Each structure stands twice: as C-alpha cells, then as structure tokens.
C-alpha cells in the first residue's frame, strides 16, 4: 500500500527530463546519466579531487570537539530532509531505496519538498557526489559488458536481475546507455527482475520505466517491463530457482547490485548469491555492482552513519568470490566504493 501523500508545491520541470511519482505521490525526476543534467565527472582526476576535498573535511572535523560536531549534525538533520535520512534513522542499518534515490538526483535536480538551501548544500557534498558516481559507473559497466553479449544473441529475451536495487535505477540507466549506443540491441523483450524486500522503491521503478518508454522518451519503443519479487539475500533459494527457470527458457541473464548486496551482505551471503547466479555455468553471464572501499577515508566517514556497511575493497572482494564461478574483470573507482564487473568463468 503506498504511503500517504504529502504536499508538494508546483515547480518548473526541466526540458528533456522524465518525471515519475513516488509512493507518496511526489513527482520527482527520473535519473538519466546520459543527460548532462545528471552526469557527474568520474575520471580519475575528478575522483581524486573529491577525495582531497573529503580528506580536508575529515581533518577539520577531527579538530572539532565531539559534542560540537554532534550538535552540528543534529542541526543539519533538522533543516535538511536528505541529511535527516542519512543521519537520524538510528533504527535502520541501511539507507532505504528511495532515500538513496533522492540523494542521487544532484543539487540542481532537487524538487519540492527536498530542495531547501540545506538540502542543496547536502546534495553537493563530496560523499553524495561519490554515490552519484557509483550509480553512473555501475550502469556503464553493465551496459559495456552487455553490448557484445546482446550482439551475439539477437532477439533473445534479456532479463536484468537487480538485487536489493530499490528503484532499479542502475538497470534502467544501463538500458538508456545501450539504447543510445546501439538501439537495435534492444529489439527484444526486456524484463527487469527487481529482487528487494522494499515496496516503495519498486513502485517508483515501475513508474519510472513507464515514463522512460513513453513517446519521445529515452526508451521509447523498447518492449520492457518490470517484475518485483520480495527477496532476502540471506536466503538465495528463490534467486536460484528464478535463474534456473530463465536459463531453461533461453534468456540472456545479467545481474547488478548497486549500493546493496556487495556492500551490506555477509561474506557467506555474497558467495551464495553469486553461486545462485552462476547456476552451474548456465545462469548470468555477467554481474555489475559496488563494493565499499576499505581505505582510511571510507572507514572514517562510516563513523558518522549507522549503516552496517562491509568495507572490503575490490582486492579483498576478488579473493572472496573465488570459486563462485565469477571473476573480477574490471574496476572503476569512486570516492567510497569500487564498482566491479564480474564475468562468468568457464569451469573445466
């Protein structure tokens, strides 16, 4: 059941941007990383500049008395919805899907009631920019790896499995990038299989997809639909069954998990989910996702949140997944996460 509606004052919609409604009936932009309005510079030099800015902020915070720092954090949470979502929900061990989505919009794309000066300042922080880069890089990795796979199997149904993805915005953006590169590759049935215990994120995801496939929108003409299944990654049996069924039907299967499975799940759950995706070499051909970095900057930042992230970094993660049937093929670095592309191995 959607959450009760909350008031939203009229605002000017940006040309060339799609909009969809949340469970609370708020109209917000649909992120399209191919649109300059949402794109973030993610080259090595830009990421390093963000890192240095974050280091400077961390050092200033370290010199500040703890009671004063806590007071400033509480004050920020009172003035900014976005800050409140990240800093005050002490009963939650992860950032909810739609809260995460809102901070990915970027300061210039915020709409009422999330567009106060405090919200805009918060959305411009380096750590938030890093989360936007995380989305952009995950979508790019997925699209880049899918391009040759789709070329080899024209017309085969494409199923994008999104684990813990909330709004599935990484899957949607991978499709947008593919459409812009080679539109003919999406001349096939496309299904986003959204596996998430949440309901608000998937509801928005379905509405976002409807907006994207509308006339003159980025995915206009694409035969795409979204299916939501409530899923707990600590019990991968439903995933195993889904992958086996899709493989038997001859589908092309790819998976992603941006800001979810590889960042929050235990080692055992990460391994079990990858083994389910592998399906004895007949399942997903590739997986894209984000891994929390384990450097000093990331660990220092985590002390200001209540989220139970698992700082591993790409190297430790690569060791962890040995034997699952996947290997790390490519890594893109952001501020607090490494985005990884996993390719299926051929076992003897």
Q: What does each of the following model-derived ranges do?
A:
Residues 103-109, 164-169, 291-293:
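Short glycine-enriched loops at secondary-structure junctions
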Residues 110-115, 171-172, 295-300:
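Short acidic/His/Gly/Ser-rich catalytic and metal-binding motifs that mark active-site loops
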Residues 8, 45, 52, 129, ...:
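Residue-identity detector for glutamine
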Residues 2-153:
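Rossmann-like AdoMet
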Residues 70-72, 110-115, 182, 246, ...:
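Short hydrophobic/aromatic-rich motifs at helix boundaries and adjacent loops
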Residues 2-8, 12-18, 22, 58-69, ...:
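Alpha-helical subdomain
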Residues 120-249:
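Conserved adenosyl
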